[in-house]
Amino acid sequence: MKVLHVLYSKIYTGAEKVAAQIIKAFEGKVDMAYCSLECEEVWDILDGMGIRHYGVEELTPATLSRVIREYRPDVIHAHDMRTSFVAALCCGKIPLISHIHNNAYDARGLLLSKGSFDHYGRV
């Protein structure tokens, strides 16, 4: 099984550390990769941890689709609201996990009903 973790950041703090910890916890059991905005500082950390990573200039359905075609994940694990929406637009039949790390600042101006994510199914 292959899992692609998707984040929208150029830093290595909360959600980024969680994604890296999940990847390391499943090392040798599940093939996982990390995708986020390009950032040499983050890449250096991930390289030091032995984590495969993909960088995108901007996270859009087109750029994420390119990574998906290259990596060919069985599951996509999106780590915030923005990445969840972008991933939902391009994941097709690939199961999507939407992991919201309580970063409510991403939700400003959005009004979502509880059922909004039901459309994408459950993993």
Predicted regions and their residues:
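Membrane-interface segments of envelope glycosyltransferases acting on lipid-linked substrates or membrane lipids
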Residues: 1-123
